[in-house]
């Protein structure tokens, strides 16, 4: 296993790179960050792109601490050439999760910048966890996601000691083929309601902001058996519902006809920044879940079918979603039965250790008490 250095050591390694000056970012850097991502993602043929609003929303979120978790590298002319992101999730304690990300200008690759950035990201995640860890906190997990076709990023992750632990498929379905029709039942004039032919006793409703707390509870319960799901806080949920990409008019709720209780949902988004590169418009199903009590009754199929009708009604050419290749609920088979096909693949890499193991890898000078000669230095898009 590759050792993780102390954060001070990792910062010194960044400073040793010739021709680049490193500093923390501020809100004024957001447009430059977005431009660098756009250039690099076009070069890398990323299936999913980062938009300006994505970065703005991250920066402005009360959960984010970009002045700790982000580092920027500029060349001698002041141009931004590299971004490192060690996104520490401070909202969830069941798992102490750090999302590793970043970008290097394509013209500056091969100089060791990405290697040094990833070392800092790992070191920063360890430093944050050690400084903020409390009794009852879960293990530290540091993860990086990358399209499977980006072999250079795969090699970078593996050299840093990360291992591929899971794969996800992007899937799509053209909307020029017929979508099954669900008869309209005019039960509530303000909020249209649809009967679900194959899911007797269940109705579909428009997304209703007044039921957002109930929707969050359904999401949490429905995803409990999904890999690496550690919960969604009310703040995280609210950020999704107010995101520029979220489309409430495409989102659908499923309720039990007898009790009125929510039993499933399909939440959808529009990632317009992806459309030009992929060559078509697309409605994206962000989350699809059904409570265990109502699975096997066609509810998920009905939710997807209704989502597709809404996408098509808005002029979208395709319906898209992402799925865990090892999803335990048989989701992959369901999507294929509805005409979805695989469009791309994503790998998730994880540093294979918990917090206790990582601490043993940290430089001795960074573990001394404050009274010793050394010092401790606390630190910090889907589908």
Where are the predicted features?
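A short, internal acetyl-CoA/4′-phosphopantetheine-binding micro-motif in the GNAT/acyltransferase core
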Residues: 72-74, 89, 99-113, 285-295, ...
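Core beta-strand residues in small-molecule sensory/regulatory alpha/beta domains
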Residues: 72-75, 255-257
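Acyl-donor-binding surface of acyltransferase catalytic domains
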Residues: 1-13, 88-92, 97-199, 347-351
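Active-site/acyl-donor-binding loops of N-acyltransferases
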Residues: 2, 145-147, 157-180, 305-306, ...
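Short amphipathic alpha-helix that is part of the acyltransferase structural core
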Residues: 2-59, 184-188, 194-232, 360-383
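Extended hydrophobic-aromatic, low-complexity segments
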Residues: 215, 226-228, 250, 261-266, ...
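A conserved beta-strand-loop-helix scaffold within acyl/acetyltransferase catalytic domains
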Residues: 41-64, 84-93, 226-288
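Conserved acetyl-CoA-binding loop-helix of GNAT-fold acetyltransferases
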Residues: 110-127, 287-290, 296-313, 318, ...
């Amino acid at each position: 296993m590759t050792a993780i250095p102390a954060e001070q050591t990792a910062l010194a390694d960044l400073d040793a790179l010739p021709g680049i000056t490193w500093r923390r970012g501020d809100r004024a850097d957001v447009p430059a960050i977005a431009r660098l991502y756009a250039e690099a993602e076009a070069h890398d043929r990323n299936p999913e792109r980062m938009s300006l609003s994505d970065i703005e929303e991250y920066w402005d979120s009360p959960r984010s601490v970009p002045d700790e978790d982000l580092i920027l590298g500029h060349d001698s002319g002041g141009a931004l050439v590299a971004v490192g992101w060690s996104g520490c999730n401070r909202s969830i304690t069941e798992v102490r999760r750090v999302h590793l990300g970043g970008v290097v200008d394509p013209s500056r690759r091969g100089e060791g910048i990405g290697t040094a950035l990833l070392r800092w990201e790992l070191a920063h995640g360890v430093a944050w966890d050690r400084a903020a860890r409390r009794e009852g906190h879960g293990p530290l997990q540091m993860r990086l996601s990358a399209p499977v076709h980006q072999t250079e990023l795969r090699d970078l992750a593996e050299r840093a000691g990360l291992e591929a632990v899971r794969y996800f498929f992007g899937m799509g379905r053209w909307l020029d083929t017929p979508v099954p029709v669900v008869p309209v039942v005019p039960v509530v004039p303000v909020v249209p309601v649809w009967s679900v032919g194959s899911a007797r006793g269940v109705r579909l409703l428009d997304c209703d902001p007044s039921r957002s707390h109930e929707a969050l509870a359904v999401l949490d319960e429905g995803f409990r058996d999904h890999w690496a799901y550690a919960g969604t806080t009310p703040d995280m949920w609210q950020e999704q519902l107010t995101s520029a990409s979220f489309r409430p008019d495409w989102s659908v709720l499923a309720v039990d006809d007898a009790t009125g209780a929510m039993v499933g949902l399909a939440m959808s988004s529009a990632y317009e920044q992806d459309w030009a590169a992929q060559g078509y418009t697309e409605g994206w199903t962000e989350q699809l879940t059904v409570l265990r009590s109502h699975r096997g009754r066609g509810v998920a199929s009905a939710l997807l079918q209704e989502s597709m009708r809404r996408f098509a009604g808005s002029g979208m050419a395709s319906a898209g979603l992402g799925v865990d290749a090892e999803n335990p609920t048989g989701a992959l088979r369901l999507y294929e039965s509805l005409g979805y096909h695989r469009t791309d693949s994503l790998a998730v890499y994880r540093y294979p250790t918990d917090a206790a193991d990582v601490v043993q890898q940290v430089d001795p000078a960074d573990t001394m008490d404050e009274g010793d000669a050394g010092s401790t230095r606390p630190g910090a898009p889907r589908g």
